[in-house]
């Protein structure tokens, strides 16, 4: 009979899961990712050692760096890793907290789904809670004077204490603050702080970490092109080019038929004259240094050397932009169009030093640099990479405070204050939504709880007394001292976090939880390529994504 035959809509190669199974699978995947980096929160955090596919070693406790290296299969786990990257790009800090918080938000929702509560009810309660969380955070935030150096250093320090670099915290804080203050650029009342482009971190293995410093200028890994050129110039006049000082060959292939010997000599002579003219155009401005992104021919080197001009070639475009910002030069594409105001005179010194086996060009003592280089020294590549990651976080924290000078207390204090506010508000609520709403308050406590666990103190006793403390008047700055596992007033301890980071953490965590709760069906198909081969070899689920 026809009626009993099953109707196949989806291809037989696809695998489909739906309903409760999907939701619990997503929640478990999110919890697993959160558990991986739970121990990386706070000053007593552990490090993770990861092997990348190329066989290199990554040692870090930075949430984003760990998750970047992990290969995952589950789609929900992939979206969790994605939020850590978003957090890192947006505010540069709080990558570990956002994953732990999102995992916990999903974990507390599981209980309601088991009781057959509809996901949309949970979602609307979460969204309501997010609005209240944001308003409570803004209430407990305090403004900060960005010109107060001591205060700025203590803010950066509270970000650094959770990292490897905490042993050299005062050095790192000063480096981060100086670097960010250098690249800060104000135009028409608009602040711009582009750390990625203009604050470059150069890592040179060798020496000790105490040798690290911020250069008021730029350092590039290049030597002069001719051994007889000057390597130490005070107040240099710098010309920056992005064209080559070589004979220009035509775009398309050209054939020249030469019948007489004089013609060949003339062609060579024309090449020489062309290069000579290029060099003359540059030399008439009397520069001390010519830096180009392209090549410099031997003949051009000879002319420049005779004019006592130092030349450096094949510099990266990004480095050239930084040099332009540091010494006030303008990058020129055609040497014949060079004018006096294209020459950079802002640098105080150009010198070439040998560090280890390599030569480095230092353009320092700039009058008003808008770009800088952070020179890092250390024992090994792994340590240097971790220190660089820590410094990037510190600089991002500094940038966030300069752009939005509002602070909230750290050490789990703001989480407890927000949780207390949500619990109080939920008492006045009616209907089924009050339970998921209250669960958000419970989920927020995961941050202080993890801090207590990571320093080996008694979780139940401390968390209960912290909860009791927050019910009292004007105690919203009390939190956990991650070093000792005791309760302290964060105002006295001086541990603050930028409001921008906290807001982004909460928004991202709740949005991700909401996104994953909305999923009730996962259809995973096979890849088209290699399907037949997989069937022949009998590889189980080889093409499955």
From Swiss-Prot:
Subcellular location: Cytoplasm
Binding positions for ADP per the UniProt entry: 42, 94-97, 162-163, 411, 482-483, 497, 502
Chain positions found as Phosphoserine: 11, 170, 243-244, 252
Positions with a binding annotation for ATP: 42, 94-96, 411, 482, 497
Tagged with keyword Iron: no
Phosphothreonine PTM sites in chain numbering: 430, 459
Biological process, per Gene Ontology: binding of sperm to zona pellucida; chaperone mediated protein folding independent of cofactor; positive regulation of telomere maintenance via telomerase; protein stabilization
Disulphide bonds in the chain: 366-372
Keyword Hydrolase tagged: yes
Sites bearing N-acetylmethionine, chain numbering: 1
Residues with PTM Phosphotyrosine: 247
EC nos: 3.6.1.-
Segments of this protein annotated with the region Disordered: 1-24, 526-545
Protein name (database record): T-complex protein 1 subunit gamma
Residues engaged in binding Mg(2+): 93
UniProt xrefs under InterPro entries: Chap_CCT_gamma, Chaperone_TCP-1, Chaperonin_TCP-1_CS, Cpn60/GroEL/TCP-1, GroEL-like_apical_dom_sf, GROEL-like_equatorial_sf, TCP-1-like_intermed_sf, TCP-1_chaperonin
GO cellular component entries: cell body; chaperonin-containing T-complex; microtubule; myelin sheath; zona pellucida receptor complex
Species whose genome carries this gene: Mus musculus (Mouse)
Pfam families, A to Z: Cpn60_TCP1
């Amino acid at each position: 009979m026809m009626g009993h035959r099953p109707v196949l809509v989806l291809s037989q190669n696809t695998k489909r899961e739906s309903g409760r199974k999907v939701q619990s699978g997503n929640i478990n995947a999110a919890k697993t990712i959160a558990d991986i980096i739970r121990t990386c929160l706070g000053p007593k955090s552990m490090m993770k050692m990861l092997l990348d596919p190329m066989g290199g070693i990554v040692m870090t406790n930075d949430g984003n760096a760990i998750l970047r290296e992990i290969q995952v299969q589950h789609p929900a786990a992939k979206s969790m890793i994605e939020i850590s990257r978003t957090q890192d790009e947006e505010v540069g800090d709080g990558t570990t907290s956002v994953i732990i918080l999102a995992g916990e938000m999903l974990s507390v929702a599981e209980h309601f789904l088991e009781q057959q509560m509809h996901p949309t009810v949970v979602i609307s309660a979460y969204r309501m809670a997010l609005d209240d969380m944001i308003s409570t955070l803004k209430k407990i935030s305090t403004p900060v004077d960005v010109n107060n150096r001591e205060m700025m250093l203590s803010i950066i320090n509270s970000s650094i204490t959770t990292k490897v670099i905490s042993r050299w915290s005062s050095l790192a804080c000063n480096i981060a603050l100086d670097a960010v203050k250098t690249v800060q650029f104000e135009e028409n009342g608009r602040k711009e702080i582009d750390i990625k482009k203009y604050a470059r971190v150069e890592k040179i293995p060798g020496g000790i970490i105490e040798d690290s410093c911020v250069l008021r200028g730029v350092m590039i890994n290049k030597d002069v092109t001719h051994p007889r050129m000057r390597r130490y110039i005070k107040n240099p006049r710098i010309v920056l080019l992005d064209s080559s000082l070589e004979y220009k060959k035509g775009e398309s292939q050209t054939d020249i038929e030469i019948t007489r010997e004089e013609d060949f000599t003339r062609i060579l002579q024309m090449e020489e004259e062309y290069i000579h003219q290029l060099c003359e155009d540059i030399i008439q401005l009397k520069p001390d240094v010519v830096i180009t992104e392209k090549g410099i021919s031997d003949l051009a080197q000879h002319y420049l050397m005779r004019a006592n001009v130092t030349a450096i070639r094949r510099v990266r475009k990004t480095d050239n932009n930084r040099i332009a910002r540091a010494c006030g030069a303008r990058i020129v594409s055609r040497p014949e169009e060079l004018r006096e105001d294209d020459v950079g005179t802002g640098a105080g010194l150009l010198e070439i030093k040998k560090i280890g086996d390599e030569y480095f060009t230092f353009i320092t003592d700039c009058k008003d640099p808008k770009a800088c280089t952070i020179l890092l020294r250390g024992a090994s590549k792994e340590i240097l990479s971790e220190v660089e990651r820590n410094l990037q976080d510190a600089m991002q924290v500094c940038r966030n405070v300069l752009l939005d000078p509002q602070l909230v207390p750290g050490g789990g204090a703001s989480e407890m204050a927000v949780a207390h506010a949500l619990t109080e508000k939920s008492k006045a609520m009616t209907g089924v939504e009050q339970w998921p709403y209250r669960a958000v308050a419970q989920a927020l406590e995961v941050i202080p709880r993890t801090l207590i666990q990571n320093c080996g103190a008694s979780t139940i006793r401390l968390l209960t007394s912290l909860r009791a403390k927050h019910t009292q008047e004007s105690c919203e700055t009390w939190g956990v001292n991650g070093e000792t596992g005791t309760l302290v007033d964060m105002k006295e301890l001086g541990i603050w976090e930028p409001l921008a980071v906290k807001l982004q953490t909460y928004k991202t965590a709740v949005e991700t939880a909401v996104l994953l709760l909305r999923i009730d069906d996962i259809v995973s198909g096979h890849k088209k390529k290699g399907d037949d081969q997989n069937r022949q070899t009998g590889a189980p689920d080889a093409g499955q994504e």
